[in-house]
UniProtKB/Swiss-Prot annotation:
Name of protein: Chaperonin GroEL
Keyword hit for 4Fe-4S: no
Organism: Allochromatium vinosum (Chromatium vinosum)
Transmembrane segments: none
Localization per record: Cytoplasm
Gene3D superfamilies: GroEL, GroEL-like equatorial domain, TCP-1-like chaperonin intermediate domain
């Protein structure tokens, strides 16, 4: 085990604070509409230009181990806020720096760190309740667009396209972000349920122009095993042929004689059929087949529940308004399943999303939920160069998270105003002793910091503007983009409540840990490896080796 370097008391806290300042000073220049960019070196390729706080924080590793510990703890604030709310990382970092700075001054003056922490926690709790009271729901597409615009660093094209996507696929819908091929942002919306499996034979194609199989008002057969024997399928095929409707078969696989017979029947026009493989693998395949069954009103033919293919009837089949099968994907539009069943299935999947601890599983469950509940929208980000594309894509993803948070918990006035208004709830708060009162004052002072930083980044005098905003009431605030005062909500400067709340709670949590730190332990720096001995061979008079 390597030797350790241990620092105590004020010495440890000072080193930790230096690390906090290095990280926070690099991150906070990005805050607000007039925030600056940060350029990040990459080990290969062009450098990355970003205004995203968490991207800057993640890049920072310091040489001094004790400074690095401080930086990593604040980095945790940014990451945690990003994970919970998807945005607000810079605000959280600015709040944490202010709380730690003021807290360590109080500790150096001889106050009890534990009482300071209790006071800060009490103040943040009161401020959080006040934020919830200030919060207003975010129903209008216009408000969603404004939240997206603010989060995307005042790029209104991003805010507008996100609002449009949300309107089309609903709150539960999946919105994904991809690299585009043009200079403009584009929006693609897939209605209905789409999964990534195409036709098993090109002979099923009936629309030569789009190279797809299109089935109007088809029956849908769902089977969880392979189909290789046509005899098993005959009863269903005869029933479908009599009804004069097309048939979509979704099974683990359709092969051999069964596939050949289906192709021949389709070519001759006896019955219009298309076969596709079931989506997913293993348990996920079973779950997705069940989703399709509920969406279309079908029953999954499975030997596990005592159903066999040769005994299947038309009542076991589902229906939909239209099905489109391409080379790589199948889209079922307007399935005829019951609304009540679909809602119940969505609730079940939501419960699984809450329970799962795996990010991958959560993503897949949310995809399934979107396919059942709304649809899928793809935002294709357009840019002139790859560097711009990466930077813009990161901003779109940030804005998307922020708008989801706004829909979830509502909105508060932006530009640091909500936190200034929340100070009112903390003003008359009293702690159990003097040190707790100082803790409350520390949190109160820190809550002014985001507004001060936004104003400083805009090149104005923070104290003057803060005083004027604090004298106002409600949504009155300062628009740093154009230097005007007014109603922040009317000016479209909004923050999701969830983002502001998470930033405040997470920064207080880490600041509390840091001011109550009394010792820090790190590995001793290793001495450089000894130099290689001079060349030469034994008994040869130290003859140099070439």
């Amino acid at each position: 085990m390597s030797a350790k370097d241990v620092k105590f008391g004020g010495d440890a806290r000072v080193r930790m604070m230096e690390g906090v300042n290095i990280l926070a000073n690099a991150v906070k220049v990005t805050l607000g509409p007039k925030g600056r960019n940060v350029v990040l070196e990459k080990s290969f390729g062009a450098p990355t230009v970003t205004k995203d706080g968490v991207s800057v924080a993640k890049e920072i590793e310091l040489k001094d181990k004790f400074e690095n510990m401080g930086a990593q703890m604040v980095k945790e604030v940014a990451s945690k806020t990003s994970d919970i709310a998807g945005d607000g990382t810079t605000t959280a970092t600015v709040l944490a720096q202010a709380m730690v700075r003021e807290g360590l001054k109080a500790v150096a003056a001889g106050m009890n760190p534990m009482d300071l922490k209790r006071g800060m926690d009490k103040a943040v709790e009161a401020a959080t309740e006040e934020l919830k009271k200030l919060s207003k729901p975010c129903p209008r597409p216009m408000a969603i667009a404004q939240v997206g615009t603010i989060s995307a660093n005042s790029d209104d094209s991003i805010g507008t396209i996100i609002a449009e996507a949300m309107e089309k696929v609903g709150k539960e819908g999946v919105i994904t972000v991809e690299d585009g091929t043009s200079l403009q942002n584009e929006l693609d919306v897939v209605e209905g349920m789409q999964f990534d499996r195409g036709y098993l034979s090109p002979y099923f194609i009936n629309n030569q122009q789009s190279q797809s199989a299109e089935l109007d008002a088809p029956y849908i057969l769902l089977y969880d095993k392979k189909i290789s024997n046509i005899r098993d399928l005959l009863p269903v095929l005869e029933g479908v042929a009599k009804a004069g409707k097309p048939l979509l078969i979704i099974a683990e696989d359709v092969e051999g004689e069964a596939l050949a017979t289906l192709v021949v029947n389709t070519i001759r026009g006896i019955v219009k059929v298309c076969a596709v493989k079931a989506p997913g693998f293993g348990d996920r395949r079973k779950a997705m087949l069940q989703d399709i069954a509920i969406l279309t009103g079908a029953t999954v033919i499975s030997e596990e529940v005592g159903l066999s293919l040769e005994k299947a009837t038309l009542t076991d089949l589902g229906t939909a308004k239209r099905v489109q099968v391409g080379k790589d994907e199948t889209t079922i539009i307007d399935g005829s399943g019951s609304e009540i069943d679909i809602k119940a299935r969505c609730e079940q999947i939501r419960a699984q999303v809450e329970e799962t601890s795996s990010d991958y599983d959560r993503e897949k469950l949310q995809e399934r939920l979107a396919k059942l509940a709304g649809g899928v929208a793809v935002i294709k980000v357009g840019a002139a160069t790859e560097i711009e594309m990466k930077e813009k894509k990161a901003r779109v993803e940030d804005a998307l998270h922020a708008t989801r948070a706004a829909v979830e918990e509502g909105i508060v006035p932006g530009g640091g105003v909500a936190l200034v208004r929340a100070i009112a709830a903390v003003k008359d708060l009293k702690g159990a002793n003097h040190d707790q009162d100082v803790g409350i004052a520390i949190a109160r002072r820190a809550m002014e910091e985001p507004l001060r930083q936004i104003v400083a980044n805009a090149g104005e005098e923070p104290s003057v503007i803060l005083h004027k905003v604090a004298e106002g009431t409600g949504n009155f605030g300062y628009n740093a983009a154009n230097g005007e005062y007014g109603d922040m909500v009317e000016m479209g400067i909004l923050d999701p409540t969830k983002v502001t709340r998470s930033a405040l709670q997470n920064s207080c949590s880490v600041a509390g840990l840091m001011i109550t730190t009394e010792a820090m332990i790190a590995d001793e720096p290793k001495d450089d490896a000894p130099a290689m001995p001079g060349g030469g061979m034994g008994d040869m008079g130290g003859m140099g080796m070439m």
